[in-house]
Regions:
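Catalytic cores of nucleotide-sugar-dependent glycosyltransferases that transfer UDP/GDP/TDP-activated
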Residues: 1-294
Length: 294
């Protein structure tokens, strides 16, 4: 049986701010569990609804330093199972407490997710789970492939693990002062070069993931390889185009079924959608105080 670990900063039904959460919530459920052992790990945000948090199971804990500036931090590991998928949650109240999963403090966010990336790898031997593939998502998981190919490379447990990183939003890359990022990550000097983590003399988490991941997927076919849409990384992405695939997002047909979706005014199906979609449009126009028309 092959093993896959999804690593992300958000995942439905636990926490969602955008489409990333939909993908990480829907895709793991679709694997045939007879052939795939699929698990997911996200931070244990205090804003995850109590209906889930009250059912989390304690797995283990340990203490970890991610760099000279981040020493001896508590890492708790919690677990929850749903729809045949095991979800893990990395617990640290210093980083993951608040009314929202994210803050506007970029410096803190980079420190937080650098810690998260290293904690995810560090927990794997303790829970006795060695994935064949680790599927990373967006800049928040960018340092995981970097750690795997460098700091963790000497440990036989991690040999043979492959990584994929998916870009959901290239505009956000996790960029900050190189010296400070090195201080919170513990990554060595030789990694902060223009062909690796350096970006315009700063450090770039997403770039690190794109350099060190074994494969890259995007939610568009080829736009990000162009200068206009490449957000400064189009050269790197073009250089790796043989290891990259564009996969346009689909939808969860159970969550977005117009026959059963309770979030629309009037449910419909293939035989009556013309009439009933008009009813939905009319109700929306009325609710927003717009002129009602066809």
């Amino acid at each position: 049986m092959k093993k896959i670990l999804f690593v992300a900063s958000e995942c439905v039904p636990f926490i969602k701010t955008g489409g990333l959460a939909d993908v990480c919530g829907a895709l793991p459920k679709e694997f045939d569990k007879n052939y795939w052992d699929v698990r997911v790990v996200i931070p244990d945000y205090s804003c995850i609804p109590e209906q889930y948090r009250n059912n989390f199971e304690y797995v283990t804990h340990f203490y970890m330093s991610s760099g000279p500036y981040v020493q001896d931090k508590y890492v708790g590991v919690l677990k929850y199972e749903q729809d045949g998928v095991t979800y893990y949650f990395i617990d640290n109240q210093e980083f993951f407490t608040g009314f929202s999963p994210y803050t506007s403090d970029t410096k803190f966010e980079i420190e937080k997710y650098t810690f998260f990336d290293k904690a995810v790898l560090s927990m794997l031997p303790l829970i006795d789970f060695k994935p064949d593939i680790i599927h990373c998502h967006d800049w928040q998981t960018g340092f995981l492939p970097v750690y795997l190919k460098n700091e963790f490379a000497a440990n036989p447990f991690f040999w043979g693990i492959k990584t994929i990183i998916t870009i959901h939003n290239l505009k956000f890359q996790g960029i900050w002062d190189r010296e400070w990022v090195q201080g919170v990550s513990g990554l060595t000097d030789n990694l902060f070069t223009p062909d690796k983590l350096e970006f315009k003399k700063d450090a770039n988490m997403l770039k690190g993931g794109l350099v060190y991941a074994d494969y890259i997927t995007t939610v568009s076919d080829n736009e990000i390889q162009t200068e206009y849409y490449g957000e400064g990384l189009n050269g790197l992405l073009s250089a790796r185009h043989f290891d990259m695939q564009g996969i346009v997002n689909g939808i969860d047909y159970n969550a977005y079924d117009p026959q059963t979706d309770g979030r629309i005014y009037c449910n419909y199906n293939a035989s009556d959608f013309r009439k009933k979609k008009f009813n939905n449009k009319t109700k929306l126009q009325q609710d927003l105080g717009l002129a009602v028309d066809k």
